[in-house]
Amino acid sequence: MATAKGIAIGIDLGTTYSCVGVFQHGKVEIIANDQGNRTTPSYVAFTDTERLIGDAAKNQVAMNPQNTVFDAKRLIGRKFNDPVVQADMKLWPFQVINEGGKPKVLVSYKGENKAFYPEEISSMVLTKLKETAEAFLGHPVTNAVITVPAYFNDSQRQATKDAGVIAGLNVLRIINEPTAAAIAYGLDKGGQGERHVLIFDLGGGTFDVSILTIDDGIFEVKATAGDTHLGGEDFDNRLVSHFVEEFKRKHKKDISQNKRAVRRLRTACERAKRTLSSSTQANLEIDSLYEGIDFYTSITRARFEELCADLFRGTLEPVEKALRDAKMDKAKIHDIVLVGGSTRIPKVQRLLQDYFNGRDLNKSINPDEAVAYGAAVQAAILMGDKSEKVQDLLLLDVAPLSLGLETAGGVMTALIKRNSTIPTKQTQIFTTYSDNQPGVLIQVYEGERAMTKDNNLLGRFDLTGIPPAPRGVPQIEVTFDIDANGILNVTATDKSTGKVNKITITNDKGRLSKEEIERMVLDAEKYKAEDEVQREKIAAKNALESYAFNMKSVVSDEGLKGKISESDKNKILDKCNELLSWLEVNQLAEKDEFDHKRKELEQMCNPIITKLYQGGCTGPACGTGYVPGRPATGPTIEEVD
């Protein structure tokens, strides 16, 4: 399988679900995974025997909540003591530990405790999407565009890029999710003069509002706003709390401390929420939810809307903020685009429609797929796709937060203003604060507050060796250079000596070191190899089991009466039963053991079966094309535990 040159994929790495697409033959294909689903849960599970990713991981979550990791996007690029991390930890069934100020997820895998960085968990989801694309395209894929919320800061973008590297991807670019949705939308709407588009993206875990202008194939992001912690999961949480209370009232029992019960309830709540987008009532039926009690109940759409009323109403605040930032009246918006599965909720649509005085909402793009669609187009552009559809597309992104440095008195002096189009480069001259000052400390911040103490420190460095001079005389030129991925380089130069020092905002922000990333790449390969070994082991076990059952049915066949001696028949049956009993207690044996046992059985059965067939036969087992020594041909049926 040679890599096809010039093919790149677009990946929407979501908090709860992810999606992958590819642009080929003039159109975007959203690629279904091995379960036939066009979105894949961003879940990774660890068990005593294997690692599961995607649907398989989500499907077993009720049985194994402590070792099933999701929401890695809420941890990625954050510090352990970040209030967001601390608040989320209370809701997660898995354990998050502090290692050198960074969060790691602690799970039990193959009987041992293992800790993973969020980047590693995300890389496993990315690997699954990469394999999904490779299975569809029929060749390896390395180039990808990955999307992030517009609100992600520098360290979250870097960490997402690192996750791509660990998964063996060459990340061409990190782009904002709303920008990707706009590309998808822009392709659907060709040249109609300048249009102002509001993108309302309410997904499983994040909420983004963006205002763009699209003019003649050029996209410009005018403003972004949102809430990094609002989405479908929060609506699920409201339903869960509601039903926990209902269970208390009905059965006088509190299930909130039982992780498995809560997880099963959450799964049912997510299903009910989806049902309520198309029906006015949903039923929940959970057998033996807690202490043997069956929980059968229902909820109406009106009650659901009441439970989430403040959250739904709250979605309009970022809309107003984005309009203010873009200095735009709501009447100036031409199109309102819905992105993210949660925008299917009728109440959310109604609130938005009412806010825009009854305007039609644009729902022509599948809200779950729009972001991956746009990322796939952007990937094609970056790979130099020359087709007319993508040729005229130019992408202008923005910096989500102002970037600047601390000046005398702890004041934030912004060089790159929030919502500036990126890539961009800004230079400013600074000077010393006191006489004969030998050096300056350059401290780089992101944020909108007037004082640096209220903003987020990205990194710092010293510029030393400034010749003695009165205050205000030395000239220090500071340049902020932000690239298309939103990654920042800051350079300071003393004009008199030409001395230079610089920083790329990476490690000081808790980014993984190069060594750590390399180690994780190796780990990822190791886990992949282990998964392969596990698959081979199961195949060997199934081969042994089906051979034993096959032999039992062959020798017990009524049509063979008299063709096989009773002692031979019993010999085979006893051996088969002995092996099947051995299998019962040795489910976790190694592949070699299964193979060895099968060979042992074959060696015993083959002479008897050969003798039987040489003796000529007329029974139903004849003429089936059975070749001694080889398992019977025919479809391979994978067994599901």
From Swiss-Prot:
Identify the stretch(es) annotated as Substrate-binding domain (SBD). Answer: 396-511
Residue intervals passing through the bilayer: none
Question: Can you tell which superkingdom this protein's organism belongs to?
Answer: Eukaryota
Sorted alphabetically, which keywords does the UniProt record give? ATP-binding, Nucleotide-binding
Query: Region Nucleotide-binding domain (NBD): which residues?
Result: 3-388
Q: What is the effect of changing K73E?
A: No rescue of PRKN translocation deficit in knockout cells
Subunit field text: Interacts with PRKN.
Q: Does the keyword Nucleotide-binding apply?
A: yes
One of its Pfam families is HSP70
NCBIfam families, per the entry: PRK00290.1
Q: What induces it?
A: Not induced by heat shock.
Native organism: Homo sapiens
By sequence similarity, the record places it as follows:
Belongs to the heat shock protein 70 family.
Question: Can you name this protein?
Answer: Heat shock 70 kDa protein 1-like
What Gene3D superfamilies would the database entry show?
1.20.1270.10, 3.30.30.30, 3.30.420.40, Actin, Chain A, domain 4, Substrate Binding Domain Of DNAk, Chain A, domain 1
- UniProt binding sites for ATP: 14-17, 73, 204-206, 270-277, 341-344
Expression tissues: Expressed in spermatids.
Tell me the Gene Ontology biological-process terms attached to this UniProt entry.
Answer: binding of sperm to zona pellucida; chaperone cofactor-dependent protein refolding; positive regulation of protein targeting to mitochondrion; protein refolding; response to unfolded protein
Any one Gene Ontology molecular-function term assigned to this protein's record: ATP hydrolysis activity
**Cellular-component GO terms for this entry:** blood microparticle; cell body; cytoplasm; cytosol; nucleoplasm; nucleus; plasma membrane; zona pellucida receptor complex
What functional role does this protein have? Answer: Molecular chaperone implicated in a wide variety of cellular processes, including protection of the proteome from stress, folding and transport of newly synthesized polypeptides, activation of proteolysis of misfolded proteins and the formation and dissociation of protein complexes. Plays a pivotal role in the protein quality control system, ensuring the correct folding of proteins, the re-folding of misfolded proteins and controlling the targeting of proteins for subsequent degradation. This is achieved through cycles of ATP binding, ATP hydrolysis and ADP release, mediated by co-chaperones.
Q: What is known of its domains?
A: The N-terminal nucleotide binding domain (NBD) (also known as the ATPase domain) is responsible for binding and hydrolyzing ATP. The C-terminal substrate-binding domain (SBD) (also known as peptide-binding domain) binds to the client/substrate proteins. The two domains are allosterically coupled so that, when ATP is bound to the NBD, the SBD binds relatively weakly to clients. When ADP is bound in the NBD, a conformational change enhances the affinity of the SBD for client proteins.
Which PROSITE patterns does the record cross-reference, listed alphabetically?
A: HSP70_1 (PS00297), HSP70_2 (PS00329), HSP70_3 (PS01036)
In the UniProt record, does the keyword ATP-binding occur? yes
